Amino acid sequence: MPRFITELKRTHSCGELTKADIGKEVVLFGWVNNRRDHGGAVFIDLRDRAGLTQVVFEEDVRPDVHELAGQLRLEYCVGVRGKVVSRGGNVNPKLRTGEIEVHASDLEIFNRSEPAPFQIEDEIDTGEEKRLQYRYLDLRRAPLQRTLMTRAKVNHLTRNYFTDGGFLELETPFMVKYTPGGARNFLVPSRLNPGKFYALAESPQLFKQLYMMAGFDRYFQIVRCFRDEDLRLDRQPEFTQIDVEMSFVEQNDVFDVMEGLVVKLWKEVLGIEIPRPFQRMPFEESMAKYGNDKPDLRFDMPHVVLTDLVRQHDGGGVPLMHEAVKGKGIVKAMRVPASANFSRTEIDKLEEYVKGMGAKGLARAKVGEGGEWTQSPLAKTITPALRQAINEACEAKPGDLLLFQFGKDSVVHTVMANLRVHLAKRMGLIPEYGSGGAWRFLWVVNPPLFEYDEESGQWAAAHHAFTRPHDSDLQFLESDPGKVNCYRYDLVLNGFEIGGGSIRLHDPEVQARVFKAMGISDEEARSKFGFLLDALKMGAPPHGGIALGMDRLVMLLTGAESLRDVVAWPKTQKGTDLMTGAPGDVDARQLRELYVKSTYEPK
């Protein structure tokens, strides 16, 4: 064992010594972050997760220690003993320890390091693949260490908050029964049950509901979940969520608990007071104004739905608008304030941008002093009455730019939603991380329970089939499922959905009606969810809950650009681990024991 480990104990971290410690003898452990040899003295910056401390090895004080220090190189892992002294006029204001240095009297090299494949510095230009390949080195960099320490703090605060609130931290199984539909599952073959598979849980949904039926009326868990889906910057195949369920609650009770957690996290982590209650917006309003159910409210520029207006004016001389409203399409406009000075080139770039999302083009009009439209093909045919009505609906002013989309609602919503954010970034309307107005929380409520699947010709649950419909909409379950809204809610922050949940169905008869509306027979429902249906008949309480995405929450709290920056050991966008080589091949004997055979043929 190293001498420093058995004979000495670390007294301080490398980030905590100040001028108040001058004169103390200290023992520090860490890595050589920087090294400078001035002949009679060797200087190093010693680093651990708390920060940096300058250490000086002087030849005329301890020649043997100075000689050993001459062997030090970057990333050597060492222990140092010495006295804290003032740096006098050589203060480094960038460091918390910048007023002092440690004059070493002893040194032990715990381990040497080969030259690192990249610099261990805050800002590096090394490609992400190389950093992920050597993730254990990447994690030595201060920005990532700060992020993971923030994540640990969020874990700690979350556990304390729920425990203090009377919640029980309970576990749920990772290996569960596979049920078709929903997210694609990772499958685990069962050696003891040949030909059968477990699925890795994509969420604890059913088990946390069963906890409520078992009488554990306040549950939480910080839980790992798994989804085999295509990856993006804000997705990982394994992810962590803060999972919560409560009995004897309605929607507002869930909001109150979760707002309390969020306010605590922002206060304790960032020192920022978030006002309560959070804004609430019906799903229908969110789609109409912003084109999606997770709007970024840090800036304005809402959409205006003009469908009824255009219909009232019988198309108003614009054939494409008329065609859209005659069918099932919609017409939307967005006012871009004081932007009539956009050049033709800039407008053309916007048009190329929307075409990349499936739009046929980008109709536009610049508003003149008298409300007339200029530099717009629409101006040639639109009736004055419709033009004036659109100006009034959009609250258009001279110098504004109006942008239009018309056609299939799903395309129009998506195009206009993305265009709004694209323009806001370009125009500098989005507050920077950490600035005033940087946090806009929103509950999006009352969405449809079902969405129509044109391919199968069936109604499907928009989220999951265990959400309680509005009582006033139960009459439509059989006759018109598209009219059924539900007690589902999403917590949105700055254009990201950071959590979602619902009040659950606890009435077995209504649950059966929901399954039938989805074309699920009694036999199929019993095959997939028989255990839940039985539990619902055993005095199931009213209950509801939510799950917050821990990874995304920390990403937003820290201002990270990607989930891979807040997960210690992330996968790439292809789902691979470049450090360990996962996923990898499996021994043929093990596959035989699992009764599994690969049919994959490399191209």
From Swiss-Prot:
It catalyses: tRNA(Asx) + L-aspartate + ATP = L-aspartyl-tRNA(Asx) + AMP + diphosphate. It comes from Anaeromyxobacter sp. (strain K). Aspartyl-tRNA synthetase with relaxed tRNA specificity since it is able to aspartylate not only its cognate tRNA(Asp) but also tRNA(Asn). Reaction proceeds in two steps: L-aspartate is first activated by ATP to form Asp-AMP and then transferred to the acceptor end of tRNA(Asp/Asn). It is found in: Cytoplasm. SUPFAM superfamilies: Class II aaRS and biotin synthetases, GAD domain-like, Nucleic acid-binding proteins. This is Aspartate--tRNA(Asp/Asn) ligase. InterPro entries: Aa-tRNA-synt_II (IPR004364), aa-tRNA-synth_II (IPR006195), aa-tRNA-synth_II/BPL/LPL (IPR045864), Asp-tRNA-ligase_1 (IPR004524), Asp-tRNA-ligase_1_N (IPR047089), Asp/Asn-tRNA-synth_IIb (IPR002312), AspRS_core (IPR047090), GAD-like_sf (IPR004115). Pfam families: GAD, tRNA-synt_2, tRNA_anti-codon. HAMAP family: Asp_tRNA_synth_type1 (MF_00044).
